């Protein structure tokens, strides 16, 4: 079974991607094979296995990004189609696609599922410097998600008025594009110092979930290196999932003194994903 629609990926040229404004992005329709998309959609992970993030403080005055989140690591149990898809994403074909449109870098991909409920939003932000790009796959359809409920991914134009480490509101930014995250499609965008993006609060009925699968295209950085030394992946998670029910699973702990200068978290609020040696 092939999951990536290689013909569609081949149609994305480096020039068209890199010259897109206000920063490099592409909405890729039919980015998965029809059979692969349907198989993945039918075997999405159950929300009961996710961590629920509510009110997690962000830097620079940005509003929290509430959501259910499942971070993939060896040991995380997902359906066979998802194991096959992730293996394909780690293989040479997808890696070559990324190098063609993003440049000849060393990529360290990480994978997450995001589910969001009524009222959840993604406040405007630029991603961390270790994230060269993000590739978001949509897993709602017209049958289970109405466009009237929102959820559109907004490509925002700051007109270079705001520093990357700031917290502008939606009203202070222009909407360059509004991406409907439904059906077999995906959004690839490159991180820059002005790659602002966000999602306004969802207005869906209770019980409905907006479902996405994200690939974070990390590149080697001091932060990534330091986390690897400490047995973590680029996102700060242990390289292997903790056994179900263990103390570390789904819990964040305050940073230790040694990692406060390194971690990208706010001291005393979010902290690391795993206990420091002192806890």
What are these regions (language model features)?
Residues 50-51, 134, 236:
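A short, polar/proline- and glycine-enriched secondary-structure boundary/capping micro-motif
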């Amino acid at each position: 079974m092939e999951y990536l629609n290689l013909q569609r990926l081949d149609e994305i040229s480096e020039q068209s991607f890199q010259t897109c404004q206000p920063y490099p992005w592409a909405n890729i329709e039919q980015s998965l094979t029809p059979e692969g998309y349907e198989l993945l959609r039918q075997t999405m992970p159950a929300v009961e296995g996710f961590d629920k993030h509510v009110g997690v403080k962000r830097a620079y005055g940005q509003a929290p990004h509430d959501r259910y989140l499942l971070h993939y690591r060896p040991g995380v149990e997902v359906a066979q189609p998802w194991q096959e898809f992730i293996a394909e994403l780690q293989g040479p074909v997808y890696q070559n696609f990324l190098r063609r449109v993003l440049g000849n870098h060393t990529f360290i991909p990480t994978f997450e599922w995001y589910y969001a409920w009524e009222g959840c939003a993604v406040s405007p932000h630029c991603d961390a410097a270790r994230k060269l790009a993000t590739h978001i796959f949509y897993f709602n359809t017209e049958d289970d998600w109405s466009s009237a409920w929102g959820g559109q991914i907004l490509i925002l134009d700051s007109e270079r008025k705001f520093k990357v480490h700031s917290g502008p509101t939606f009203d202070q930014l222009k909407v360059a594009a509004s991406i409907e995250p439904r059906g077999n499609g995906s959004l690839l965008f490159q991180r820059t110092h002005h790659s602002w993006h966000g999602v306004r609060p969802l207005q869906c009925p209770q019980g409905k979930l907006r479902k996405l699968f994200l690939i974070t295209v990390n590149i080697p950085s001091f932060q990534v290196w330091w986390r690897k030394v400490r047995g973590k992946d680029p996102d700060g998670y242990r390289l292997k999932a903790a056994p179900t029910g263990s103390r570390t699973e789904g819990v964040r702990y305050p940073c230790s003194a040694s990692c406060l200068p390194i971690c990208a978290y706010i001291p005393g609020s979010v902290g690391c994903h795993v206990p420091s040696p002192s806890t």
